[in-house]
């Protein structure tokens, strides 16, 4: 399902026009990004959590130059579904 499909389905289900639904989805996406950027996790009860996971520093190889590089410690965004969502998908 694409964002356009999601907008269409929500608009059809709620009776709200597509522009308003798209604005809400974009705003939600921006708020989640902003929260994660500032180090805050986002918890959506009954759906899941958008959290930051720490990746440890590691050594990697650049095979084209045959050199070793150090990738510093960093954080990546991660979605952790709630148990209810996991059970729904499992069937």
Language model features: what each stretch is:
Residues 1-91:
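Strongly charged
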């Amino acid at each position: 399902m694409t964002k356009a499909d999601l907008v269409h389905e929500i608009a059809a289900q709620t009776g709200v026009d597509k522009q308003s639904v798209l604005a809400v989805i974009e705003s939600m996406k921006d708020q989640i990004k902003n929260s994660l950027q500032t180090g805050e996790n986002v918890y959506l009860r009954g759906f899941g959590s958008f959290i930051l996971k720490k990746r440890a520093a590691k050594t990697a190889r650049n095979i084209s130059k045959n050199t070793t590089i150090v990738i510093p410690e960093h954080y990546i965004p991660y979605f952790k579904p709630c148990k209810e969502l996991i059970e729904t998908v499992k069937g």
